């Protein structure tokens, strides 16, 4: 499996049954860059068989900066215009650009609905030396109504020291997934028709905090120390 980290801190799994991580919890507007390591290196923990994806969070830039992004989205499948995305951020550096502060919030509501088609065929008895006609046994038409409501917040504090940096980053991401399924089942073999309805709600919360100290002592010698906290909660 692969490992997901934020500023070098392992992001806790968001799935209760495996080690997978839902990377949609991280807004693209919070990122300065992405580091991809295909195989483990000597400076990394040996707790992953695959590669590592490290999301690098933004830091405040010199001068006062503010940014607002608004998006309105029309969904043609559901014929709705209620989807939106709002991003607001503010940042500045103080004391001759030594101290930096950055805060950002990201609000998003998206319709992820879809239509699914499932079918089953029979060709019994299936022999390798013969060609049998296929018979259509059943078909399932499903209308899947999905809605994702996400809230992300980010706070980054950093201070420049001689040949180094001390920083704190706090990421809090919440997403609520509502899904309702309406299925129309055509059981052709028994000449029957069934209707099924199902509903599911999934609330995911991810928190990641990191204190980091970096300093270059000599041209070929540097020190890097950090303490971190990572948590995920999945209610369904």
Model region roles, listed by residue range:
Residues 9-38, 88:
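Short acidic/polar hinge/loop motifs at secondary-structure boundaries
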Residues 42-44, 75-78, 140-144, 192, ...:
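Outer-membrane beta-barrel domain signature
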Residues 79-181, 204-219:
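Transmembrane beta-barrel wall of Gram-negative outer-membrane proteins
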Residues 15, 31, 62-71, 126-138, ...:
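Flexible, solvent-exposed coil segments and beta strand-coil junctions
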Residues 1-10:
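Extracytoplasmic beta-strand/coil segments of soluble accessory domains associated
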Residues 33-41, 52, 57-92, 142-143:
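Short strand-turn segments of transmembrane beta-barrel domains in outer membranes
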Residues 37-39, 56, 69-75, 106-108, ...:
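Outer-membrane beta-barrel pore domains and translocons
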């Amino acid at each position: 499996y692969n490992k997901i980290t934020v500023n070098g801190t392992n992001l806790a799994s968001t799935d209760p049954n495996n080690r997978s991580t839902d990377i949609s919890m991280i807004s693209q507007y919070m990122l300065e860059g992405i580091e991809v390591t295909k195989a483990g290196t000597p400076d990394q923990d040996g707790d992953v068989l695959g590669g590592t994806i490290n999301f690098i969070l933004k830091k405040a830039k010199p001068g006062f900066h503010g940014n607002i992004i608004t998006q309105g989205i029309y969904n043609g499948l559901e014929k709705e215009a209620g989807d939106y995305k709002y991003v607001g951020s503010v940042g500045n550096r103080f004391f001759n650009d030594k101290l930096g502060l950055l805060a950002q919030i990201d609000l998003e509501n998206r319709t992820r609905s879809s239509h699914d088609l499932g079918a089953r065929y029979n060709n019994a008895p299936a022999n390798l030396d013969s060609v049998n006609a296929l018979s259509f046994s059943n078909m399932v038409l499903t209308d899947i109504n999905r809605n994702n409501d996400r809230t992300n917040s980010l706070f980054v504090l950093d201070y420049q020291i001689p040949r180094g940096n001390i920083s704190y980053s706090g990421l809090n991401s919440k997403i609520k997934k509502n899904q309702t399924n309406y299925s129309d089942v055509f059981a052709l073999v028994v000449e029957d028709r069934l209707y099924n309805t199902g509903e599911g709600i999934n609330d995911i919360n991810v928190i990641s905090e990191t204190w980091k100290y970096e300093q270059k002592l000599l041209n070929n010698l540097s020190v890097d120390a950090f303490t971190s906290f990572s948590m995920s909660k999945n209610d369904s």
